[in-house]
C-alpha cells in the first residue's frame, strides 16, 4: 500500500512538472499556412525591420512562412521562421504585401522574427535575425 501511494505521488509530481515546463514556453502552431494573422505579422516584421537597416534601398518581403510558435505572456509573443527576399519596392515608397513582390534575382534568406502583441493589439518587433545568405 505504501509503495502504491508513493508511486501515485511520484507520477502525479512528474505530471505537474511536465505541465509547468509547457506553461510559459513557446508552442508550435500547425495551422500557420492557413491563418492570415501569421502572414500579416510576417509582413509587418519584415517591412519594419528592413526599413530600419542602414544602407538598404529596398524593402524585404515575405516569400514563405515556414514555422510559427506562440508564447502567452501579458499578451502574445509570436516567433516566426520566414523565407524572405529583397522586394521590388524602394524604401521611399509605402510597403504593401500585395505590390511589393520578391525581386526575381534576389537571394532568399531564412530569418526568425519575434513580434510582441500586447493585450490592446499593439505590435512591436522584438527581434529579427537572418542567416547569412
UniProtKB/Swiss-Prot annotation:
Name of the protein in question: Salivary cystatin-L2
Entry's transmembrane regions: none
Induction of its expression: Blood feeding does not affect expression levels.
Main location: secreted
Keyword check for Repeat: no
Limits of the Cystatin domain: 34-118
Organism: Ixodes persulcatus
Annotated signal peptide: 1-18
The family this protein is said to belong to: Belongs to the cystatin family.
Lineage: Eukaryota, Metazoa, Ecdysozoa, Arthropoda, Chelicerata
Pfam families found in the cross-reference section: Cystatin (PF00031)
Gene Ontology molecular-function annotations: cysteine-type endopeptidase inhibitor activity
Recorded superkingdom: Eukaryota
Localization terms from the record: Secreted
Amino acid at each position: 500500500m505504501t509503495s502504491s501511494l508513493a508511486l501515485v505521488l511520484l507520477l502525479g509530481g512528474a505530471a505537474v512538472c511536465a505541465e509547468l515546463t509547457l506553461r510559459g514556453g513557446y508552442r508550435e502552431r500547425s495551422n500557420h499556412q492557413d491563418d492570415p494573422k501569421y502572414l500579416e505579422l510576417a509582413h509587418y516584421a519584415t517591412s519594419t525591420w528592413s526599413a530600419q537597416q542602414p544602407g538598404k534601398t529596398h524593402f524585404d518581403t515575405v516569400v514563405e512562412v515556414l514555422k510559427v510558435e506562440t508564447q502567452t505572456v501579458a499578451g502574445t509573443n509570436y516567433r516566426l521562421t520566414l523565407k524572405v527576399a529583397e522586394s521590388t519596392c524602394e524604401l521611399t515608397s509605402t510597403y504593401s504585401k500585395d505590390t511589393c513582390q520578391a525581386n526575381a534575382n534576389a537571394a532568399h534568406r531564412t530569418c526568425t522574427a519575434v513580434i510582441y502583441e500586447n493585450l490592446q493589439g499593439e505590435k512591436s518587433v522584438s527581434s529579427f535575425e537572418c542567416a547569412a545568405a
